[in-house]
Regions:
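Acyl-CoA/ACP chain-elongation machinery
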Residues: 1, 14-71, 284-322, 355-369, ...
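Condensing-enzyme catalytic core mediating Claisen C-C bond formation in acyl metabolism
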Residues: 106-150, 309-387, 393-394, 495-500
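Conserved beta-ketoacyl condensing-enzyme motif
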Residues: 1, 10, 16, 119-120, ...
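Conserved small-residue
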Residues: 1-2, 6, 38, 95, ...
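Glycine-/small-residue-rich "gating" segment that lines the acyl/pantetheine channel
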Residues: 65, 70-81, 226-233, 274, ...
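Active-site-proximal alpha-helical scaffold in enzymes
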Residues: 29-50, 67-75, 100-102, 181-193, ...
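Active-site pocket-shaping loop/turn-to-helix segments
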Residues: 1, 29-32, 166-182, 234-241, ...
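Flexible, low-complexity linker/loop segments at domain and module junctions
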Residues: 12-15, 68-121, 197-200, 385, ...
Length: 500
């Protein structure tokens, strides 16, 4: 694919092109490969020396000469050349590609942030409550709660038929990717975004996941450990990479814009929204999908149980337990700038008007992290939104029943809100779905601001000394805060505003 692309682009414009592959020397280092390639590119540029592509036999060189045309593929020999611009390329399964151009001279690329508002215009939900936004609204309004300590979302033929997935496509995907594809397609449909040849490169996505396709990775590794490396399945191997889900969704929809997978623990779903918002504000896309997806399986149950984080019985937020209800699911959120949203009369669930992501390093194994890290995220998000903390009408938090997580949240909320602001917890309904839950907190907040959820909802008032649960009226909410936390001390906060 790279060979053909180079000829297509450069045959007429740059016939003296030199091409080198560092993988011939260092092997394929998977996720590190792109970074290693970039280091080689920079060294080549600064020293005017192009490293060789090693490993060619005489027969290889003869065959290459017949196809290379005027390009120099650097077979086995380093060459000196006066270099001004060097391109580093990288690709991954599912059609994800990246290119960086390095130059000795200062470039003319300027980052300019636009002043357009960014709206949430579509949602997609796959959860243990069932699939679809309408189903989620019904179940939450009916106060349906988990009845087991490990709960699961499911996708099946009804979902595939609804979104036109053919067997030849969906049989290739593992559960992680299937959940992501279904929620992503619903969000696009809800937003009324139609992918065309004209707009495909202006529509992108950021997939957030804490654990990714870990079940598939485990099963693949277990199989080759027991049966030898030759027993590895070429059919299943593409699903072992974290960005496979985003690649499959891109293939299905035809979206060819920015496509990145964010892996930053349980708050990755909210991080994806922060990054997607920034891409739109920096004029790198008119619309983006921000998603959070994580899987529950027998493998995940064993791993989280080994950490001592699966509850012994069903726990709600602030219950003082030692673990949480383990869950899975996928939440996708469509974001659009105001011009693009207006061009197709999109529904506006809420405006995204501020965010922050922080990290406060903690000791290995520390689940909750530090109060300072969460505090900084909340303060910075409010500052970006241009509001004061006392303008926040409600919080959509991350308490999950595990005492060390819930206590951190209680301390910070008391410090900022003094127990006067209602706190909503989506994990009470769906369990701890990690990245899916952090994105769902934002989706739930948006559904509240838009009036799609019932205006009378359960919420907590929390201090370090006391927690009370009350039914609150959400109809007057104007600004709301959503927060998330991940093992290791990573935090995210997002401010949403009701659309007038």
């Amino acid at each position: 694919a790279e060979f053909l692309s180079l000829h297509t682009i450069f045959d007429e414009t740059n016939p003296d092109l030199s091409v080198s592959s560092t993988k011939a020397m260092v092997g394929h280092c998977l996720g590190a490969a792109g970074a290693i390639e970039a280091v080689f590119a920079i060294k080549a540029l600064t020293e005017n020396k192009i490293p060789p592509t090693i490993g060619y036999s005489e027969e290889d060189i003869e065959a290459l000469g017949e196809k290379a045309g005027t390009f120099d593929f650097m077979p086995n020999t380093m060459k000196e050349k006066d270099l001004h611009y060097v391109m580093s390329n990288s690709f991954a399964f599912g059609g994800s590609n990246a290119s960086i151009i390095f130059s000795k001279e200062p470039g003319n690329v300027k980052e300019t942030e636009n002043d357009e508002k960014v709206y949430i215009t579509g949602l997609g939900i796959v959860s243990p409550l069932g699939n679809g936004v309408a189903n989620y609204i019904d179940k939450v309004n009916a106060q349906i709660k988990p009845e087991a300590t490990s709960v699961h979302a499911n996708v099946g033929k009804e979902d595939y038929d609804k979104y036109g997935l053919k067997m030849a496509f969906y049989r290739k995907l593992d559960k992680f990717s299937l959940m992501q594809v279904i929620s992503g397609l619903e969000a696009l449909q809800e937003a009324g975004i139609e992918v065309t040849e004209e707009n495909a490169e202006e529509l992108g996505m950021i997939v957030g996941t804490g654990d990714g396709p870990l079940t598939t990775v485990y099963e693949f590794q277990e199989h080759i450990s027991e049966n030898g490396t030759t027993a590895g399945s070429a059919f299943n191997f593409p699903n072992t990479v974290y960005n496979a889900a985003g690649g499959y969704l891109s293939i299905k929809t035809g979206m060819r814009g920015y496509n990145v997978t964010v892996t930053n623990g349980a708050q990755s779903g909210m991080s994806s929204l922060c990054y997607a918002y920034n891409e739109i504000k920096q004029n790198r896309g008119k619309a983006m999908l921000a998603t959070g997806t994580d899987e529950n399986s027998e493998v995940m149950e064993k791993l989280y149980a080994k950490l001592g984080k699966v509850a012994g019985d069903v726990k709600q937020a602030y219950a003082g337990g030692d673990g949480f209800v383990l869950a899975d699911g996928s939440t996708s959120i469509a974001l659009e700038n105001e011009t693009y949203a207006a061009s197709h009369n999109a529904k506006k669930y809420a405006e995204v008007c501020g965010y922050a992501m922080t990290h406060e390093g903690v000791a290995y194994g520390d689940v909750a992290g530090t109060e300072k890290g969460l505090m900084n995220a909340i303060v910075d998000a409010a500052a970006m939104a241009g509001i004061t903390l006392d303008q926040i009408d409600a919080v959509y938090g991350f308490a999950n029943g595990a005492d060390e997580v819930d206590t951190l949240e209680r301390h910070v909320y008391e410090e900022i809100f003094a127990g006067k602001v209602p706190v909503h917890q989506v994990r009470d309904y769906t369990g701890e779905g990690r990245a899916a839950s952090s994105a769902l907190s934002v989706a739930h907040a948006a559904l509240t601001l838009s009036g799609d959820l019932a205006t009378r909802q359960n919420a907590y008032y929390v201090t370090t000394e006391e927690v009370t649960k009350e039914v609150v009226d959400t109809s007057a909410y104007k600004y709301v805060l959503a927060t998330s936390c991940a093992i290791g001390g990573s935090y995210a906060a997002v401010i949403l505003k009701k659309v007038a």
